[in-house]
Amino acid sequence: MVYRTRGNGIMKKYQDIKNFRLIDAPVNRGKTQAEINIGAYFLESEDGQDWYECQSLFSDDTAKIMYDPEGVIWGVVNKPVPQRGNTYAVSMLWPVNMSVAEIDAADCPDDCRGDGTWLYQDGKVVQRGYSPEELRKKAEAEKI
């Protein structure tokens, strides 16, 4: 959790939960028979938070950003989801080996996508710049 000043000068609490990884079962309990039957998967953050349980910590009116250890964005919810009550639903993300942060929806560019071309840095979403080597590899991959 981090606190940032919004445009109106008011401090607001934002979630930034880091490094989710797949686990067999939540540490605070074993799998239920129903979870075994359907083959349920679980994620746990580096500070021990269960993915399903910590989703309630995120605000319904903030954009959600899923990013890797280098800050590259691979998932984003920057528009309300009609199937989730027109909220910015963090449940749309599945952050295996990723972190999830929230920012004010107005601070998330409309054209931001989870395609690796954007970065999450210091609480902000910015267009990614590529090194010459990354550009060469990208061009080679597009030839295939």
Identify what each model region corresponds to:
Residues 2-144:
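Interaction-interface detector
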